[in-house]
């Protein structure tokens, strides 16, 4: 945990002299990201052509620049990760690892797929993503960085499971490749190629250079939470708290569905309260502000209601939001880890002695204040200073005993809004029985594994489906999930 223990370098396959070698971007080659492999799964309630899915995916990845995604991961003599890009991709050295399983049965009749999460009429815990590993990746797919380093395999694994009325499409990859924003770009561009709209695929940005290499070398203002940076014995006390907590409590993952009407009512109420409190008739909070405040209140519900314990909320923030006019042009695809963090500091009592609107508005203000170009650059400067001083880019802001919740909202990635209808062989579920159009995902699911770090309290928000429901999931203490499940089940319908 926390990278305190290191193992010797794995033995790599023989090098290919014709490979193009490119170092990973600094933001990609970190201790945390090295330890994580992720899988994204999409359920389509239609029968999709697996051959079309495979060929269009390969066609996208073999475009100029995009070929980098098919690279093999290797360690150089300095212990840093490199991309080894084959001169050409073929059956011996494919651009993507491909697997396909077909079941001659409805998705609703299969013993495992019949348990896939379904939307609920009220906020509810609807499943455990780990229960579906058999459906989301093949047994041969790499599960750790060690697997990638010791085998001559591409970074992406495409696994398709076909039923008589549905199709599950899953992509697994090392987190060193990209974040949720980059993953969404791959997904959307794949759909463009599938639709024969290749000319609309944006050019690949940063093929053999890092556009963020010098970002944060200077900053025009201090970072807003500089005084909260943990150093010295306070940092080590924080680590001890985390190690103890990880040892004492078992971690488990769950999937939560939040119906659209429920969240809309919560947001409407919050905006009314905020405007009445501030006298500002233009004050607002977003769906994300309300959703993260609402779930954080659930997650800290085991503490005494009047506790002054610090609760730190982190929202991932895409750097392209502030760098879209220069370093990360919006007209190009940047497949890398290019997110920063925006923090909000509250206390447990803020969630239980004040209305939910208080926490939601605090999150909104943090997003507005911390999401400027100047503040994003100031935080990046702190990260670079931490790297120079301590050998990693992991500054910790807050206090040693704080409770942390982290969120990454992928709604803007439009996972539920991407059109795969060009691959339909046969429509599955009747149109009147579903909210989404044929060829659009009815479910998006995520899972991640880390060989070194506890991913507890990291909650991706997968987005909003066609019916308006929000989906989020992630690992918490098992006892916390059991309490949340009970509270949601017993909450009166409004």
UniProtKB/Swiss-Prot annotation:
Keyword vocabulary terms for this entry: Nucleus, Transcription, Transcription regulation
InterPro entries per UniProt: CAT-like_dom_sf
Known uses: Calbistrin A has been reported to possess a number of interesting bioactivities including antifungal active against Candida albicans and cytotoxic toward both healthy and leukemic human cells.
Predominant location: nucleus
The organism's place on the tree of life at top rank: Eukaryota
Induction (UniProt): Expression is induced in complex medium (Czapek yeast autolysate medium) supporting calbistrin production.
Entry's localization field: Nucleus
Any one cellular-component term (Gene Ontology): nucleus
Biological role: Transcription co-regulator that might be involved in the regulation of the expression of the gene cluster that mediates the biosynthesis of calbistrins and related compounds such as decumbenones. Calbistrin A is a secondary metabolite with an interesting structure that was recently found to have bioactivity against leukemia cells. It consists of two polyketides linked by an ester bond: a bicyclic decalin containing polyketide and a linear 12 carbon dioic acid structure.
Protein name per its UniProtKB record: Transcriptional regulator calD
Originating organism: Penicillium decumbens
